[in-house]
């Protein structure tokens, strides 16, 4: 199978490339060349800007992709250009989306338009009624103003001439995670035994997470399986822990034996209170991916945490 991967040189993408190349698929990567991708032998390197696909159309056509995997389609304009570039080509799109499309995400961020939806959230759960969730926020992300995965999904799934699959990703963690999702707790665990304080609502809040190699395995599976066309799948590791359980798991791997204390919000120092509503879980149901396509995460939880903790502690500003 010939696979064109757009923006696959980073945190998640490099693992997807390895899996596809190891399975002897013909793989090409479209990227701007701003990072050193260290591509495996045999992977075709196409330099170009995903915002200007027309400029590298000839090179893409020579490669002749059967599947286009887009890990960095963030905006309506990008999705429309993707559809226009590949509509009628005989190819199939696999696009990365996010669990931030669900209505509970609005509630979690304090913009509730409805009571919390029941969890775990299936792929058919209500979506946000607001749009552009990061517009107006000071974020180090070039597409924050126009970011909207709901519009991306609608465009990609709405054209019968271009089969598409959408994968809604969880909070992804692991080595090379630029967001350092484990670091705040690990930093505390490297201290002098002061308890970790969790707001009461936070302690019972659930957020689906996924180890980077497990998420990559899900992407590679969908790329290889044409049965996925026309479907939306939630991705994530099981089970989805409460925040307290998650901290306890990290502590077990990190060797920390300190205390986790649940406190009312008004007893927390004001500068540590997070501007969120913990009643709105971001817990997604990943049953469909497992039952319909036979997905099974390759890396167990404890091993995933061990690798991540080891990497965090090896960083120059690590948490030893």
Q: Which residue ranges define each predicted feature?
A:
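N-terminal Rossmann NAD(P)H-binding glycine-rich loop of SDR-like oxidoreductase domains
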Residues: 3-23
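Active-site Tyr-X1-5-Lys
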Residues: 124-166, 181
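NAD(P)-dependent short-chain dehydrogenase/reductase
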Residues: 159-207, 250
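Substrate-binding strand-loop-helix patch
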Residues: 176-177, 204-214, 232-253, 282, ...
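Alpha-helical substrate-binding/gating segment
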Residues: 186-197, 205-241
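Conserved C-terminal active-site "lid" loop/helix of NAD(P)H-dependent oxidoreductases
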Residues: 212, 268-296, 317
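Mid/C-terminal beta-alpha module of Rossmann-like enzyme folds, strongest
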Residues: 218-280
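Amphipathic terminal alpha-helices
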Residues: 301-320
